[in-house]
């Protein structure tokens, strides 16, 4: 995990560098609009550091907060985090209870005044099969959603409890119930009933812990053309802003290259026109 150094002024330099980096990325207009995170490795991190599993999950929350701050400062519109899989209910009752308690505390925290939602104008959406949550937690979810519903700058989708298969099943049921008899149904119809409907399409998916699978997360969205997937060999609590900044930078360069390539296909590229397509017949030769 990236930690502050004891060098005088280190925190100030890091903050200053992050601000410059974020402004540069925003100005490039090549930032991913929607980033998804599979935050894997909290339990292994706890074992590695010989700490309680709950402490591992708490370390993961700290990492998530730092990563999301960088994303929103850099201009990312939507972040979707895989907080709790429906499959996780199969874990020990002690761990499930601990995760639910932690979720309740953190949902309250990120919606408090001065915290993530307030600081960056983030609208909180809890997506998944909410019928699996107890009444007290559902009330915290309702308050978080209600408190942030008028925030327009960015969105945070918290998948809790969630699986991609359940999301698709939910979308199919909603389509059947709401669609008029005899009307055509296509991919866009189904997409309009996904939990992520109304936010930009997924651009970038990041998974930690060195595992090469999606683990039933955003499986419909990740299948779209152009989605970049980053599989990292570090555990989630070890994933920090510096590595995230590098990923955003790579994405920006890649998108910039594709945009330039597209313009070259549509028309000649000219530095005098900032790369806009030009008509050779109208261009005067010196």
Swiss-Prot record:
GO terms for molecular function: ditrans,polycis-polyprenyl diphosphate synthase [(2E,6E)-farnesyl diphosphate specific] activity; prenyltransferase activity. Its EC number is 2.5.1.87. Keywords: Endoplasmic reticulum, Magnesium, Membrane, Transferase. Pathway: Protein modification; protein glycosylation. InterPro entries: UPP_synth-like, UPP_synth-like_CS, UPP_synth-like_sf. Its cofactor is Mg(2+). One of its GO terms (biological process) is endoplasmic reticulum to Golgi vesicle-mediated transport. GO terms for cellular component: dehydrodolichyl diphosphate synthase complex; endoplasmic reticulum; endoplasmic reticulum membrane; lipid droplet; membrane. Its main location: endoplasmic reticulum. It catalyses: n isopentenyl diphosphate + (2E,6E)-farnesyl diphosphate = a di-trans,poly-cis-polyprenyl diphosphate + n diphosphate. Pfam families: Prenyltransf. The keyword Transmembrane does not apply. It is found in: Endoplasmic reticulum membrane. It is an enzyme of class 2 (transferase). Coiled coil: none annotated. It is a peripheral membrane protein. Induction: Mainly expressed in the early logarithmic phase. Present with 8970 molecules/cell in log phase SD medium. Forms an active dehydrodolichyl diphosphate synthase complex with NUS1. With NUS1, forms the dehydrodolichyl diphosphate synthase (DDS) complex, an essential component of the dolichol monophosphate (Dol-P) biosynthetic machinery. Adds multiple copies of isopentenyl pyrophosphate (IPP) to farnesyl pyrophosphate (FPP) to produce dehydrodolichyl diphosphate (Dedol-PP), a precursor of dolichol which is utilized as a sugar carrier in protein glycosylation in the endoplasmic reticulum (ER). Belongs to the UPP synthase family. This is Dehydrodolichyl diphosphate synthase complex subunit RER2.
